[in-house]
A protein has these predicted regions:
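Metal-ion/cofactor- or nucleotide/acyl-coenzyme-handling active-site neighborhoods
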Residues: 1-249
């Protein structure tokens, strides 16, 4: 994985299909221009995953809407940008919604959410909904939480808070996701595993090693830090109350 940034990006070709002509394969390609430059910001971002810690924990009961005004300071000098994942659109309007499941992308467009909000998705969804879905630049083909984190890095943010980024716990009959049991998600009693997610996040930490990644943790989560992340000097964990203070929520 190579670090890439919005300031060097004009757009890219995506493959819509492959046809055979005269015995040879040819790709049908479309140029997708870059339409969301987003390089003018405070370099602070909040990436919100769908782990249960963001709705079910002891301590401060923080509403997602608080993140939309966090770190404002004088005239919004330190206000961060918010990135959300998949079905979170039903509960909150982040600055940027990232969707990696084509079925969910269809649902989001049909709901009307994409009419007035920025939604990033994969090439398939962009080709199907060109007026409503924006292409994830140089899509790393990762899970949604990791893709949203990558996008925040791509946009040039240098401090990224990760909220609702929970491990799948050791209970084999528990899905640690807010939307477990709903369409396009695993069953409530089906542990999805987290090794791919852990590996994807580690790749991002290593690639964007000039970014300060901060995972917000609740009671009991501190000990659940993946072993692979412990060696990342640009990654740390922060208790919820300390996060509220540091991020000026």
């Amino acid at each position: 994985m190579v670090n890439k940034y919005v300031t060097d990006y004009d757009g890219e070709y995506v493959v819509s299909g492959v046809v055979v002509k005269n015995g040879r394969k040819h790709q049908d390609r479309f140029w997708i221009p870059h339409t969301v430059p987003n390089s003018d910001h405070t370099k602070v971002a909040y990436v919100v995953g769908n782990g249960r810690s963001r709705v079910d924990f002891s301590g401060v009961a923080m509403k997602l809407s608080f993140l939309s005004t966090a770190g404002g300071g004088h005239f919004g000098k330190y206000k961060g940008q918010c990135y959300g994942c998949n079905r979170i659109y039903q509960d909150w309007n982040p600055d940027f919604l990232v969707v990696t499941h084509p079925g969910l992308a269809d649902e989001i467009v049909e709901s009307g959410y994409a009419e007035d909000n920025v939604v990033f998705g994969r090439a398939k969804s962009v080709l199907e909904h060109p007026e409503h879905i924006t292409l994830v630049p140089h899509d790393p083909r990762m899970n949604c939480g990791a893709t949203a984190t990558y996008l925040a890095c791509f946009h040039g943010h240098k401090k990224i808070y990760l909220y609702g980024f929970d491990n799948q716990n050791t209970n084999p009959t528990m899905n640690n996701n807010v939307y477990a049991g709903t369409e396009f998600y695993g069953q409530v009693d089906e542990n999805q595993g987290d090794q791919v997610w852990i590996s994807n996040m580690k790749r991002i930490f290593d690639t964007y090693n000039d970014v300060d990644f901060v995972r917000v943790v609740t009671d009991g989560m501190e000990e659940e830090m993946p072993e692979a992340w412990k060696w990342c000097k640009n990654f740390r964990q922060l208790k919820t109350w300390d996060f509220v203070i540091e991020a000026d929520i």
